[in-house]
């Protein structure tokens, strides 16, 4: 077995699609109607075409409460791996991305930085 899909909740699927593709450089894998006013929207890394797809779900009220609590605790909803955390943080900052935690060595190993995805989530940038 392997993980095929993971999902996060976003306030606006159009804005999320722009952020995750134009800013982060991911690619849309699936974009299909999925219920009233919602799409089944997945993005994936162009470096791993058979890798995990990230589903960008439209937020509902229970998800809003979970996201608020996660943000208040400073907990990212997922991590993106990089081979150079500082370089990618600088690149994202140049594109206007706001960081809530600058790149720093972590006690468990590697380097992490945390940024706001503009769609209600914190995302971790991790370097081994």
Model-derived regions: residue spans:
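Structural motif
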Residues: 3-5, 51-54, 75-77, 112
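Short glycine-enriched loop/turn motifs at secondary-structure junctions
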Residues: 1-2, 70-75, 107
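Short amphipathic alpha-helices within nucleic acid-binding modules
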Residues: 19, 86-91
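Vicinal oxygen chelate
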Residues: 4-8, 31, 39-42, 80, ...
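Short, charged/polar surface micro-motifs in flexible loops or helix N-caps
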Residues: 46-51, 60-63, 85-86
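Core segments of cupin and vicinal oxygen chelate
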Residues: 8-52
């Amino acid at each position: 077995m392997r993980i095929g899909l993971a999902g996060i909740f976003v306030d606006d699927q159009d804005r999320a699609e722009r952020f995750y593709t134009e800013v982060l450089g991911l690619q849309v894998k699936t974009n299909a109607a999925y219920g009233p006013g919602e799409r089944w929207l997945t993005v994936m890394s162009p470096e791993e075409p058979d890798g995990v797809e990230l589903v960008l779900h439209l937020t509902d009220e229970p998800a809003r409460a979970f996201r608020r609590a996660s943000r208040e605790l400073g907990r990212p909803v997922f991590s993106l791996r990089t081979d150079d955390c500082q370089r990618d943080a600088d690149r994202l900052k140049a594109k206007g991305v706001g960081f809530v935690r600058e790149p720093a060595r972590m006690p468990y190993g590697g380097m992490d930085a945390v940024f706001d995805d503009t769609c209600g989530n914190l995302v971790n940038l991790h370097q081994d």
